Amino acid sequence: MFSIPFPFLGAIVLVLLLAQMTWRQGSVVLANRPLRILLGGYALLSVLVGLRWGHGVTLLLPLQATVAVALAAWSWCCFGALAHGAGRWRVLHALPALAVVLLYAGWPDGVETVVAGTLAGYGLALLRLARRGPDALGLA
């Protein structure tokens, strides 16, 4: 029987949402570029997860871990910028993704720890930001 892994369905929904954000009433809307990049990244991550768990493709695990960590940082950059503007140290948010790439080259067993720690850290930071309510996102 034909089946589609659930992450692929999630990716389709994200791509449809991205298309709806981009093409409104017959014209291309280029606003909210960081959010559109974020949605595209999550669609890519959903496809990578679907390939891993739906079809057993393990070759893309390094890319999956790197994209996951990069999207956590990018999520913070998108929503943090709405709260207090784009910071000067924004480039430092690329360090966890760089650490994952370097760990895959030198010590692959440490990747899971870095991924879990990074996702937990950015998740807690986003929860802390969300706890302040919608008024905290003054630049939205």
Q: Which functions belong to the PLM regions below?
A:
Residues 136-140:
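Short, intrinsically disordered, charge-balanced linker/junction segments flanking boundaries
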Residues 1-113, 126-135:
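N-terminal low-complexity or simple alpha-helical regulatory segments
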